[in-house]
């Protein structure tokens, strides 16, 4: 039987909406609790150096207010390392970060930063925190992750999400080959960035991928159909992608 794929829901943009006017509404913790009820397997949040959405207080409140595993995305800096070691989330995903970017634009250059990343990864692992690296689906980067003893990688699916036709097919093959390589090296494979109802099934169908992290699309879709419905439909599509008899699955389940 094909193993169920996990869904991590990123709640950053609940905080983005809150911060547009200030105050406390909408509450990221409440969103995380609703995500759990809707079928999420974990909660992901990115504490940026400029605190443009999630704040330090949000991180504290999430620790207290949720029961799902918390995956903290962060830059590989001493400040963020100190915060991670203080809070000890279930997992930390190291990501590249530029102050001028609207969102994460690409994968971490693990191969070019081995010397600086190695002590950060080692300290996080020593604290019992699962470490992942957000990287491009590239052999050099995957082998660098292995050299850093990172137990998990998250493959950047942004280029796939922005592609069409032949380029889309090529990006999917690239992701599949990267996932197979990582699994052969005993690295757990996650994926995320730009995934939607329209493009998630081919990625979720890749058996080597254990988890997808999805945020912006789910929060945007929630404006129209509600957060729980938004997440439940994504969960449904991911399950459909992993069903051994996809036709039978679709017949037995009512599409949301």
UniProtKB/Swiss-Prot annotation:
| HAMAP family xrefs | PdxJ
- Single GO MF annotation: pyridoxine 5'-phosphate synthase activity
Where in or outside the cell it occurs: the entry states:
Cytoplasm
One cellular component term (GO) for this entry is: cytosol
Q: What EC number(s) is this enzyme filed under?
A: 2.6.99.2
Pathway membership of this protein? Cofactor biosynthesis; pyridoxine 5'-phosphate biosynthesis; pyridoxine 5'-phosphate from D-erythrose 4-phosphate: step 5/5
Q: Which UniProt keywords apply?
A: Cytoplasm, Pyridoxine biosynthesis, Transferase
**Record CDD domains:** PNPsynthase
Q: Which residues form the active site?
A: 46, 73, 193
Residues engaged in binding 3-amino-2-oxopropyl phosphate: 10, 21, 194, 215-216
Q: Report the protein name in the record.
A: Pyridoxine 5'-phosphate synthase
Q: Function of this protein?
A: Catalyzes the complicated ring closure reaction between the two acyclic compounds 1-deoxy-D-xylulose-5-phosphate (DXP) and 3-amino-2-oxopropyl phosphate (1-amino-acetone-3-phosphate or AAP) to form pyridoxine 5'-phosphate (PNP) and inorganic phosphate.
This enzyme catalyses: 3-amino-2-oxopropyl phosphate + 1-deoxy-D-xylulose 5-phosphate = pyridoxine 5'-phosphate + phosphate + 2 H2O + H(+)
**Is Nucleotide-binding found in the keyword set?**
no
- Keyword Transferase attributed: yes
As given in the record, the signal peptide range reads none
Q: Which organism does this record belong to?
A: Zymomonas mobilis subsp. mobilis (strain ATCC 31821 / ZM4 / CP4)
Residues recorded as binding 1-deoxy-D-xylulose 5-phosphate, renumbered to this chain, are: 12-13, 48, 53, 103
* Annotated positions for site Transition state stabilizer: 154
Give the highest taxon in the source lineage: Bacteria
């Amino acid at each position: 039987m094909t193993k169920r794929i996990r869904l991590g829901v990123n709640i950053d943009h609940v905080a983005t909406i809150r911060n547009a006017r200030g105050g406390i509404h909408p509450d990221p913790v409440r969103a995380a609790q609703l995500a759990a009820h809707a079928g999420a397997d974990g909660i992901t949040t990115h504490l940026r150096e400029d605190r443009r959405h999630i704040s330090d207080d949000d991180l504290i409140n999430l620790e207290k207010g949720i029961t799902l595993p918390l995956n903290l995305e962060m830059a590989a800096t001493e400040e963020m390392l100190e915060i991670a070691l203080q809070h000890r989330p279930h997992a930390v995903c190291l990501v590249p970060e530029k102050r001028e970017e609207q969102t994460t634009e690409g994968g971490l250059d693990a191969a070019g930063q081995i010397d600086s990343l190695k002590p950060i990864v080692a300290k996080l692992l020593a604290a019992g925190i699962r470490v992942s690296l957000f990287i491009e689906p590239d052999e050099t980067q995957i082998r660098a992750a292995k050299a850093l003893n990172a137990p998990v990688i998250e493959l950047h699916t942004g280029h796939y999400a922005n592609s069409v036709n032949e380029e889309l097919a090529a990006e999917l093959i690239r992701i599949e080959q990267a996932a197979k390589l990582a699994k052969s090296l005993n690295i757990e494979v996650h994926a995320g960035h730009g995934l939607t109802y329209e493009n998630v099934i081919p990625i979720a169908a890749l058996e080597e991928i254990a988890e997808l992290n999805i945020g912006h699309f789910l929060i945007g879709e929630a404006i129209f159909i509600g957060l729980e419905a938004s997440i439940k439909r994504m969960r449904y599509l991911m399950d459909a992608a992993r069903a051994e008899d996809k036709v039978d699955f679709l017949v037995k389940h009512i599409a949301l």
